[in-house]
């Protein structure tokens, strides 16, 4: 279900996406409102499920996670029990930053962040021991050109 938002809500969301740590006073100033109405709008947006949890963005490379792999998975298994086991394995692995079920020749794509190739191999061995897959292709990202969680709300 799509939640209706007005222009002030949109401006608030743009500011929160830009920097969720800024003060209510700063957000209010930037959107042309005052602190209490902005706080009330943020509260309503949270209650409506538009705003989820807040977190921080860490620099993976600065913390030693230098390898990012995109993992393409094909499976011949489609039973509910296999899928539940596989999805749990993905959710339990902290290396998996994103996991998507796809239409087409590839069944799943994962974004996996690890320290190095040896760590990827350990991840891979653990994954295939938990759930049988038909074919796995790992693609090493040579350079991250853009990475964002911001939605294009402006315009």
Residues covered by each model-derived region:
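A compositional/biophysical signature of low hydrophobicity enriched in polar/charged and small residues
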Residues: 1-155
